Amino acid sequence: MGVKGYTALIAAVTAERLVELVVSKRNLEWSKAYGGKEFGAGHYPAMVALHTGLLAGAALEARKRRFRPGLGWPMLGLVVAAQTLRWWCIKTLGPQWNTRVVVVPGATRVASGPYRVVPHPNYVAVVVEGVALPLVGGAWITSLVFSVVNAVLLRIRIRVENDALQSLT
C-alpha cells in the first residue's frame, strides 16, 4: 500500500468517524427527549482532540515511513475488525449509543451482542484501532503516543461510564 492508498484509508476512517458523530448527535437528541443525563462532559473535548490527532498524526507520519507488508496488511485486518466491532456496538445499543456518556432514566443496561462478553467492547475497538491504524502506514510514533494518552483518558472515561451505569440500578 502506497501513500495514496494509506491516505485513502485515513480518509475512509475519517468519513466513518463523521458518520459516527451524526449518529451520536441524533442519539443524543433522542436521549434528551427521554430525560437523558450526561456524565463526564469535561473530558469529551480531550477525547475529540486525541482522536483527531490520531488521524492527522497517522497521515502525516506515514509520509515519512515506508509500507511494510508483513506489518501493514495484518494491521489493516485489525482495523477492519475494530470497525466491525464498533458498528456491532452501535447496532446493539441502538439509540442508547453515543460518543458522550448519557444515561436515560428507566433504561436498562444492555447485555446482548458484544456486551455479553465484554463490559465495554467499544473501547476494545478504540484501543485496537488506535494501535493498528497508524501501523498500517508504519506510523509507530503516532500509534505509541495515541495508545499512552488513550489509556489515561480511558481510565477516566470508563470510571465515568461505570458510575453513570450504576445510576440505572
Residues of each region from the PLM?
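Hydrophobic transmembrane alpha-helical segments in integral membrane proteins
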Residues: 3-14
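N-terminal signal-anchor/start-transfer transmembrane helix
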Residues: 12-24
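Alpha-helical architecture
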Residues: 15-18, 49, 80, 117-118
